[in-house]
């Protein structure tokens, strides 16, 4: 019996995927020329699976800030902020985030994953209750495991089921933290946050919204779904990431709670991880300001998302409930999902292949993430390629029948 024997089924499934084409989990970019163009295996490729929603990875001001920071502060911090102190860019980033969200406190983490891991495991523990949307991200589930709170799942995007679960708790002791996402990362659907906030007001507890995929995308100023739904006052904690709209890496949490700052000395994923390199913190501060200065990026992003969503839907692909920057097409079976992904990559379109058990309802899907930087011509080229390969593989007609 070996250490990896428990994973033999995954090993065999992984090998089977690699045996029929490129490895979708180890794609290597020979070059990346822009937010939307790269080279994969020597082929010019449209990038449609990078979560680069506003295209800010190549923003000239963000790049200049990053270069200046690395020249003046070096390549890294070599330790946590607890042990090695904070650089001015860390403090500036937290101040700008607090100002942007209109909150008293902001805390920056080294990754978005660690933000959820740290915040959730610190806020609720044994004897408390963590009420999660069933389709929550892995980082949310992992945070719940680290904190040992009782996990109660409610049906995806179902406020009535949330209320039912809370009623069942009755007068049970312990704090209650409701956790939802702004935009869900697999198929791009949006939480019914106004209704969820109403349940929270009626039944009590705290509400945390993970705005990882909705920051910079939703809301009049880009603050996310809480802003778009008009319920920011009902949201106690907002968690987000810098690796989507802001084109960097890192995570954060903002809150108005007076005691929030104690998190810095009790939150283990914050305390025992090296802090963001100065270059990353500097580029993120600049990208945040650029996002605020350019609301037209959100408009362009939403137009591009609608163009791709409408095109795929019209061809007969089984898309999500509404257009968002994440445009997923559910495939009839895993074999054709893998073949479709390989065909698109060979034709110069890179997007994400998502397979069970990581997908809603255990159905394979192709996941595209649109950018404000995509041109109409690029999206139309993607649609043409999708249609040709989907027809050749017999994907579209079975999906049309399934939709009917």
Curated annotation (Swiss-Prot):
Concerning InterPro entries, the annotation shows: Aminotrans_II_pyridoxalP_BS (IPR001917), Aminotransferase_I/II_large (IPR004839), AON_synthase_class-II (IPR050087), PyrdxlP-dep_Trfase (IPR015424), PyrdxlP-dep_Trfase_major (IPR015421), PyrdxlP-dep_Trfase_small (IPR015422)
- GO CC annotations, alphabetized: cytoplasm; membrane
Where would one find the signal peptide in this protein? none
What PROSITE patterns is this protein classified in? Answer: AA_TRANSFER_CLASS_2
UniProt main location, coarse: cytoplasm
Give the Enzyme Commission number.
Answer: 2.3.1.50
Q: In which pathway does it act?
A: Lipid metabolism; sphingolipid metabolism
The molecular function terms of the Gene Ontology recorded here are: pyridoxal phosphate binding; serine C-palmitoyltransferase activity
KW Acyltransferase (keyword) present: yes
SUPFAM superfamilies xref list: PLP-dependent transferases
Q: Where in the cell is it found?
A: Cytoplasm
The phenotype of cells or organisms lacking this gene is: Survival of the spt-deficient mutant is much reduced, in comparison with wild type, during stationary phase of growth, especially at elevated temperatures. Mutants are resistant towards the antibiotic polymyxin B. Mutation causes hypersensitivity to antibiotics which affect disparate processes in different cellular compartments.
Task: Please indicate which superkingdom the organism of origin belongs to.
Answer: Bacteria
Give the Pfam families listed for this entry. Aminotran_1_2
- Biological process (GO), any one: biosynthetic process
The cofactor(s) it depends on are:
pyridoxal 5'-phosphate
Q: Name the keywords, alphabetized.
A: Acyltransferase, Cytoplasm, Lipid metabolism, Pyridoxal phosphate, Transferase
Which positions bind pyridoxal 5'-phosphate?
112-113, 185, 213, 241
Q: Where does the record place the modification N6-(pyridoxal phosphate)lysine? A: 244
Q: Which reaction does it catalyse?
A: L-serine + hexadecanoyl-CoA + H(+) = 3-oxosphinganine + CO2 + CoA
Family indicated by similarity: Belongs to the class-II pyridoxal-phosphate-dependent aminotransferase family.
Q: What does this protein do?
A: Involved in de novo bacterial ceramide synthesis. Catalyzes the condensation of L-serine with palmitoyl-CoA (hexadecanoyl-CoA) to produce 3-oxosphinganine. Can also condense serine and C16:1-CoA, but shows a preference for palmitoyl-CoA.
Q: Any miscellaneous information on file?
A: The bacterial ceramide synthesis pathway operates in a different order from that in eukaryotes. Furthermore, phylogenetic analyzes support the hypothesis that the bacterial and eukaryotic ceramide pathways evolved independently.
* PANTHER family membership: CLASS II AMINOTRANSFERASE/8-AMINO-7-OXONONANOATE SYNTHASE, LD36009P
Specify the protein name.
Serine palmitoyltransferase
- According to its UniProt entry, this protein's organism is Caulobacter vibrioides (strain NA1000 / CB15N)
Query: Taxonomy-wise, where does this protein's organism fall, top ranks first?
Result: Bacteria, Pseudomonadati, Pseudomonadota, Alphaproteobacteria, Caulobacterales
